[in-house]
Amino acid sequence: MSLKIRLTRGGAKKRPYYRIVVADARAPRDGRFIDKVGAYDPMKAKDDPARIVLDNEKIQSWLAKGAQPTDRVLRFLDAAGLAKRPARNNPQKAEPGEKSKERAAKRAEKAAAPAEDAAA
């Protein structure tokens, strides 16, 4: 049984409220869960301490038992200092694409050609 620490959605239409729960990975998003370990209210201000409420002891015990947090919950745990989120590094993402490299090369050739003509 693979355990996940994840969000379950509650609240009304257009007014989301999430519970942070420990659940079997195969269970539906809003279905059966094992333990409630916190809450997240995205409608509150970002600096409001009640926006994210975590039960630190329960979370640490479930992490020790092997529960895996989802990406969003891992962000919350990292901000609270309960878990470390690995830094993502993708150096290729910053590189320009092939077509833009070709365009830049053509521009450089065109700029170099008039300079050579003026020098000659």
Swiss-Prot record:
The keyword Ribosomal protein applies. Belongs to the bacterial ribosomal protein bS16 family. The gene is rpsP. Residues 95-110 have a biased composition (Basic and acidic residues). HAMAP family: Ribosomal_bS16. GO terms for biological process: translation. Transmembrane segments: none annotated. Residues 81-120 are annotated as: Disordered. Keywords: Ribonucleoprotein, Ribosomal protein. Pfam families: Ribosomal_S16. One of its GO terms (cellular component) is small ribosomal subunit. GO terms for molecular function: structural constituent of ribosome. Residues 111-120 have a biased composition (Low complexity). It comes from Methylorubrum populi (strain ATCC BAA-705 / NCIMB 13946 / BJ001) (Methylobacterium populi). It comes from the Bacteria. SUPFAM superfamilies: Ribosomal protein S16. This is Small ribosomal subunit protein bS16. PROSITE patterns: RIBOSOMAL_S16 (PS00732).
